[in-house]
From Swiss-Prot:
Residues 219-258 form a coiled coil. This is Tripartite motif-containing protein 55. It comes from Rattus norvegicus (Rat). Residues 328-355 have a biased composition (Acidic residues). Residues 417-426, 469-493, 510-520 have a biased composition (Low complexity). Targeted for degradation through the proteasomal and lysosomal pathways in the presence of SUMO3. Signal peptide: none annotated. Its main location: nucleus. PANTHER family: E3 UBIQUITIN-PROTEIN LIGASE TRIM36-RELATED, TRIPARTITE MOTIF CONTAINING 55. The gene is Trim55.
Amino acid sequence: MSTSLNYKSFSKEQQTMDNLEKQLICPICLEMFTKPVVILPCQHNLCRKCASDIFQASNPYLPTRGGTTVASGGRFRCPSCRHEVVLDRHGVYGLQRNLLVENIIDIYKQESTRPEKKLDQPMCEEHEEERINIYCLNCEVPTCSLCKVFGAHKDCQVAPLTHVFQRQKSELSDGIAVLVGSNDRVQGVISQLEDTCKTIEECCRKQKQDLCEKFDHLYSILEERKTEMTQAITRTQEEKLEHVRTLIRKYSDHLENVSKLVESGIQFMDEPEMAVFLQNAKTLLQKITEASKAFQMEKIEQGYEIMNNFTVNLNREEKIIREIDFSREEEDEDDEGEVDEEGEGEDAVEVEEAENVQVASSGEEETLEKAAEPSELAAEIQAASGPLLASSPDSVSSLPPAADVLVTQGEVVPTDSQQTTQSETSGPSAAETADPLFYPSWYKGQSRKMISNPPHTPGGEGLSQIGPSAAEDSSVQSAEVAEAAANEQAAVSGKESSSTAATSQIGFEASSPQGQAAALGSGGGADSEPARHVFSFSWLNSLNE
């Protein structure tokens, strides 16, 4: 405890000496006063040499001898308070010396040159003759042995000063090291923050530059557009003004000509001689008539001078400009997601179109296979009727030539007419050019209707089908096959000759007008009544070849 007091007293003495030294500094040379020290009327002190220098500087025209002023009298200002000091005939030597300050300077110099006192071993405050040699662990203060035996620390735990000194010194060293390390880390963080500040400034400067460039680009676009639109208005203005000025010149010329003609007429009206008047009146009247008829007053349409077509509405653009803002990362991500969704949607549409094309192609193949079945059926019937044709060649030769036919649902359609239907030509069909006994009028009408309005079959556009829906195809074809087989058996057994078959067929086709009318009625109402099955034997002609 006494050690701390001694340290405090020493520190206080040092502070007192420092304050005293500040008071002993000359305001001119800024050093400690040198003897002799003079006191001014304002109670400030100066070195006599400094006072002489400042006096000489204030009075440069006074003669000097050996660095001192010879002439008497003069004045100068105090450097501390700027008070004017008036000197008598003795000059600066007439100022009084400050002996007190000189004595204080001597004492200060003696004390400052004295060697410093070494601090002795601290003594106990309660026992002045006892040195402090132990440390109380409970009270955490150094003390003496008598305090431990008889004094206030007799019930406390104590330890030698050396052990406690080493322990606390090591703790203090560790604490200092921790502080130094933390200071290093803090300094590193400060450096990083300074770098971050520089980076922020650089990025902001770059962004400002980019923003200014973009706005300058917008300004240039606006200026360019403004110039173009202004030029358009100017061109229209010049055109309209030129047109109006042309009309003005035209009307002015006409007015001038008419005025001259009127003046001539008025002068001619004063002609006293009737003969002269009549001689020239016809010519003048003709000129007046021509002038009144030839001139056509061209008027400017109403609103010609109004330029409403150049009105500009910038409300939408102004709204867009006011909504200009910085782009955000979320908006960019949303835009990328929309683009990805659009790409996936397009891929899905392409896949679906490819599947539809495959389905359509498979449907066309199935339809072509179904269309080939009647052709195969006709070939079988033709092969089976060979013996019948061999037994009656005359009847075959008597038959008129006809085109090959294709047995379809409800009717016999020539293959030539099928090709005609696909190409949509206007030429006559085989049914129209054949014998009327073989092809009655109602069949020709139906064939013509079939050619002009071919029914649409999905997947098989080249096929001609008239009659019930495709669901009834199988039943109708099976009935045709059964009937053809029965006719074939009858022909082979000889129950009917070929001529009789041909005659009956011709008779069947050449029916009464009532039958034809009924057939036409049935052809007209194909939606409500199934078509008749008509078989032609024109395929017999091919066997002669």
